[in-house]
């Protein structure tokens, strides 16, 4: 997903669980709310509101490693013109290929970027500028496996190791703010951006339109987009208004 002009991309989030569109709080599967039984219907609602991009996560894939929810992604690609950024359970090259083949624009790799360097580097090499990294941060540590584990790996060391790869973006999520609507953790974003030249996407904590206004005013050259989830579903943010702000 390439930067379009100077405006930020708004990525409404669709989290997939058991074939439905849900939201979690802080990644806790026990705190799951179903917002739409049909991910395709939800995607069409977003498309009708003017967005061009979707951020989709397969929660079942992230936790169990299965790939059932790919059917929903195929339906969205066939029936809308939305560009899709997709992650969750992407742990081998066959899955990356399958996602690219069904039209996913940007494949997100999380856990495997930290645990299987060979696979990750091969994915980036095979699909330059189509792979993003999910950098999920939980109390200054890297969280993996559906945020159930933290890695004994310094964020700075990891960022150095990927600096020369042709990566699309780093998706920076504050796990503790995800679904909490507590506002964006700007300090965390800045701590990551100062250590890398790679484009970044902000995620976690967006609560209302003022968060987007502040993010836009900060004019970070590296922030290419922002992921918004619960605040849209709970109607704290109107997408049409949000799109005007980021442009």
What are these model-predicted stretches?
Residues 22, 26-30, 105-178:
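Conserved anion-binding
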Residues 53-69, 172-182:
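Glycine-rich, proline-tolerant flexible connector loops at the mouths of alpha/beta enzymes
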Residues 102-119, 204-208, 221-239:
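Glycine-rich phosphate-binding active-site loops on the catalytic face of alpha/beta enzymes
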